[in-house]
Each structure stands twice: as structure tokens, then as C-alpha cells.
């Protein structure tokens, strides 16, 4: 089963997808929340790596509208005390909050694969 990488930054998406591929896993990608919801509603994923701050729909809105019970790994540079971050972390589907920038992208792959 595939993973879904959702981030508006092309370099981050491609880096994560490449790291998962090197570990033998396939990924789909979405560059915003609207694309993510379309893919989530259409396909089944092992887990979702979801950015918070994105155009069209942000990560918080994706979680609110997402009906499937899929493990979610939040990937974000945002570390402020925004109320949405508290709601995101309280969502039972959120397994881990991963801060950008990533020091070791392969440790993220191990973490996600190990927890799904």
C-alpha cells in the first residue's frame, strides 16, 4: 500500500518520495489540501505525510474533512502556539509531529514505516 506525501514545496515532496522509493516504498503526492482530499477519497493509503501551511486547504482543514482513519504524520516548519496546532496534535489519527527542516530524511522513512 502506498503513502501520500502532501506538501506545497516541490523539493520537500520529491525528497520524501525519493527517500521512500530508496527504501522500497511507493508514494503518491499532492501539492495542496484540495488535491490531498481528492486522492484520500479515491485511494487507500498506508499513511499520510501532511504539511500544515498550504494553499487552498491547509493541513488542519484536510484533517477536519478527511473521513478515513489513516495514520497521519504532520510535517511542518510551523512551531507557533496557533490553536490549530493543538487540534491537529489532539486528532487521534495524528501519529507524529515532524519538524522541518529535516536533519535525516531516512530517519523519517524509518519512523513512518515503523509506526504503520
Predicted regions mapped to residue ranges:
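Conserved sequence signature across two-component system core domains
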Residues: 6-7, 30, 48
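Receiver (REC) domain active-site loop signature in two-component systems and cognate sites
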Residues: 54
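Active-site residues of response regulator receiver
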Residues: 51
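Two-component/phosphorelay signaling modules centered on CheY-like receiver
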Residues: 10-28
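Receiver (REC) domain switch/output surface
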Residues: 91, 104-116
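Acidic catalytic/metal-coordinating carboxylates
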Residues: 32-35, 58-61
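Charged phosphotransfer/docking patches of two-component systems
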Residues: 10-14, 82, 105
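Hydrophobic/aromatic residues positioned on beta-strands within the core alpha/beta folds
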Residues: 75-78
